[in-house]
Structures are given as structure tokens and as C-alpha cells.
């Protein structure tokens, strides 16, 4: 699915590592599920955007294929929305578009209104830091596509 959504597979691995530690049965405290840790609200929205019906259920996110398909699609949408900026897209993947859009309107968090330059929430800051650090390690180990 990385190729289908024009994503670097190493970036996808970074999200999977950060989100679930490669555990397909992972469930978070907010009931996000699967390798790429998706909430039901996000899953239902993406299922509709993908033109899929009830043949794919929220519980199917425990299937690695389903989780990676939906996670890659969502990551693709985040990267498109935030002009390819990995840190801003990661913040949106983690905290939602509404949160990131609101932060982009504040000068203390965005110098240009397009990318985040400051992360006001510790959890968001640590999440983005983990994604970028992991991606850096993977690209050093395996190169860039």
C-alpha cells in the first residue's frame, strides 16, 4: 500500500513501529486498533472515502493488511493536506486535522501557517519526535528510495 499511496515504505514502518511496535493485535487506551492504530471514527470516515461498505469492519483493523491499507491511506491524506511535511502530517495523524489546523493559525506554533514549528502538547511533541527519529534510523540503515 505504500506504493499505491506514494509513500516511502520506511516512513510507513516508522509509523507502525511507533504506533504498535509491530503488534497487529495492539489496542490503545482510546480503542485505536491494529498495526497503525486507528480509532473507529477515523476508520469509518476512511471506509466511506474508499467507497467500502460494511464488508470491512472496525474489528478488521487487527488484520495487518486492512490496518496497513487504511493507515497508508490516512497518512497519504495527511501528507497531501500538510504539503508533504512529515512532522506536521505526523502530528495530524496522531492528534487529528482539527487540532493541527487550529495550531497552524497561531504564530507561536507556525511561522508560515503551513507547517508546525512548535508542538504545545507533550504527547504530540514526543509522538512526532519518535516518528522522525525512527524514520531517520531506518533511512540511515536502509537508504532512501
Which residues fall in each region the model found?
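Catalytic glycan-binding domains that act on GlcNAc-containing polysaccharides
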Residues: 1-145
Amino acid at each position: 500500500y505504500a506504493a499505491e499511496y506514494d509513500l516511502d515504505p520506511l516512513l510507513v514502518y516508522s509509523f507502525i513501529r511507533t504506533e504498535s511496535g509491530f503488534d497487529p493485535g495492539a489496542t490503545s487506551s482510546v480503542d485505536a486498533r491494529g498495526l497503525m492504530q486507528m480509532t473507529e471514527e477515523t476508520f469509518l470516515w476512511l471506509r466511506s472515502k474508499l467507497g467500502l461498505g460494511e464488508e470491512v469492519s472496525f474489528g478488521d483493523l487487527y488484520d495487518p493488511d486492512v490496518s496497513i491499507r487504511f493507515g497508508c491511506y490516512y497518512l497519504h491524506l495527511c501528507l497531501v493536506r500538510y504539503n508533504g511535511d512529515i512532522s506536521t502530517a505526523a502530528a495530524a495523524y496522531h492528534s487529528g486535522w482539527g487540532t493541527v489546523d487550529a495550531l497552524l493559525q497561531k504564530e507561536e506554533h507556525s511561522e508560515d501557517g503551513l507547517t508546525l514549528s512548535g508542538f504545545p502538547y507533550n504527547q504530540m511533541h514526543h509522538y512526532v519526535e519518535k516518528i522522525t527519529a525512527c524514520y531517520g534510523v531506518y533511512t540511515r540503515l536502509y537508504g532512501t528510495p
